[in-house]
């Protein structure tokens, strides 16, 4: 496997980790929270993230990927992680890309999905239940773990000036 593909696999694992960080312990009602002005709900974001990654997968398998429609939130999160695993395995086996490059996958659908992971974290704050900060450099992220079962923070920030007031 090329270094580019190893890096993309790590990026996908980071996406899995950061998405789960934003979702872990979310209160009831968070999945359908709409911040306003037709912004996507967290549930819609997870489906959109799966859709853009499904689009990326078409460069490996051909065809088209239809937009994901929200179903059950927990099931859609599982499907999102399944898509991450599928893409990672294609990168690991040096499956041929047709019509794009590794760089284009990173600048397009992979970065799009990571942007939405950040939006999930922002929506948690707007919902009144912010995600505690951590030092991501020391996070236990593994290219072999694309599941929803991500490790707890290795180095959570001890000082959190913008923590919710109790």
Q: Which positions does each model-derived feature cover?
A:
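Helix-adjacent hinge/juxtasegments
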Residues: 58-98
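Short, contiguous alpha-helical
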Residues: 5, 9-23, 30-68, 99-166
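Short, low-complexity N-terminal intrinsically disordered segments enriched in polar/charged residues
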Residues: 1-2
């Amino acid at each position: 496997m090329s270094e580019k593909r190893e890096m993309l696999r790590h990026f996908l694992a980071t996406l899995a980790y950061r998405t789960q960080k934003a979702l872990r312990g979310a209160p009831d009602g968070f999945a359908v929270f709409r911040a306003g002005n037709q912004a996507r709900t967290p549930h819609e974001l997870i489906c959109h993230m799966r859709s853009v990654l499904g689009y990326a997968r078409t460069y490996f398998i051909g065809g088209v990927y239809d937009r994901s429609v929200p179903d059950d939130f927990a099931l859609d999160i599982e499907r999102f992680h399944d898509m991450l695993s599928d893409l990672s395995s294609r990168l690991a086996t040096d499956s041929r890309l047709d019509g794009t490059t590794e760089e284009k996958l990173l600048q397009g659908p992979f970065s799009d999905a990571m942007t939405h992971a950040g939006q999930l974290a922002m929506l948690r704050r707007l919902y009144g239940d912010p995600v505690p900060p951590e030092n991501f450099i020391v996070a236990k992220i593994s290219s072999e773990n694309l599941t929803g079962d991500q490790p707890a923070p290795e180095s959570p920030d001890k000082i959190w000036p913008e923590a919710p007031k109790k």
